[in-house]
Regions:
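The conserved Walker
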Residues: 10
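Conserved lysine of the Walker
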Residues: 14
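Post-Walker A alpha-helix
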Residues: 17-18
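Post-Walker A helix-loop "phosphate-sensing" segment adjacent to the P-loop in P-loop NTPases
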Residues: 22-30, 40-41
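ATP-dependent small-molecule kinase phosphotransfer cores
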Residues: 33-99
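ATP-dependent NMP and nucleoside kinases share a basic, alpha-helical "lid"
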Residues: 89-97, 102-121
Length: 121
């Protein structure tokens, strides 16, 4: 299977372009949103590490923004909890579409998270 990775800033057209290929698309932003809405284990980990900011499930963007704005170091803590869950979603996606000719990986932080060693294009 060919893996086509798209990365870029917010509003750069990744989602639009990824759908033009006609292959299954892994959208990391949707994965993250789904994790915040449905993954109680992630909520509990965040609440354990940052109890000042996380008070109810599902996780709200307001709580996330407050945690990040009040202390920039919190982004590393949040990322260390969220990114493994997104990687798990990505692995499940790749397993599901392993017989597909190609897949598109719409991942804004693709290079920053050093996932670029696992793509074809």
């Amino acid at each position: 299977m060919i893996r086509i990775a798209l990365t870029g800033a917010i509003g750069s057209g990744k989602s639009f372009i990824s759908n033009l290929f006609g292959f299954p698309v892994f959208d990391a932003d949707k994965s993250v949103a789904n994790i915040y809405k449905k993954n109680k284990k992630i909520y509990l980990k965040l609440k354990n590490k940052l109890p000042k900011y996380f008070h109810k499930f599902p996780i709200s963007k307001k709580e996330l923004i407050r945690a990040i704005l009040e202390n920039k170091k919190n982004i590393k803590i949040i990322s260390s909890i969220i990114h493994p869950a997104v990687r798990k979603d990505l692995k499940n996606f790749l397993r599901k579409y392993k017989k597909s000719k190609a897949v598109v990986l719409d991942i804004p932080l693709y290079l920053e998270n050093k996932l670029n060693k696992k793509k074809d294009i």
